[in-house]
Amino acid sequence: MKSVIAVLVLSLVLVNFTQAAKDDRWKACRMKCYTESKLCMNNDSKCFDSQSCNSCIQQVYSPCFNRCQEMLRRREAFKRMFAFDEEN
């Protein structure tokens, strides 16, 4: 009985750790996008008034954010595939 409880506790810890790691990677990816888009602001002193700055941010941030989304989607698909293999 103790071994069953130990396995359940370990499973919960691993699930929580995996979720936290995923969240950290997601946050790191988004922060990288934000940092890259800030370069637009540093290159344009009138950033908040400038259409070119807004265009720069959209051209940098949107594709970067989409890459983060794709990374997350692929990771989730891989986990589902691995979980399916474990069941069979």
Curated annotation (Swiss-Prot):
Q: In which tissues is it expressed?
A: Is expressed in the ectodermal cells of gastrulae and planulae. Is also noticeable in the endoderm in late planulae. In the primary polyps, is expressed in both ectoderm (sensory neurons) and endoderm (ganglions). Is not expressed in nematocytes.
Q: What is the residue range of the signal peptide feature?
A: 1-20
Top-level taxon of the source organism? Eukaryota
Q: List the disulfide bonds.
A: 29-68, 33-64, 40-56, 47-53
The alphabetized UniProt keywords are: Disulfide bond, Neuropeptide, Signal
One record GO biological process: neuropeptide signaling pathway
* Role: Probable neuropeptide.
Name it: Protein Aeq5-like1
Q: What is the lineage of its organism?
A: Eukaryota, Metazoa, Cnidaria, Anthozoa, Hexacorallia
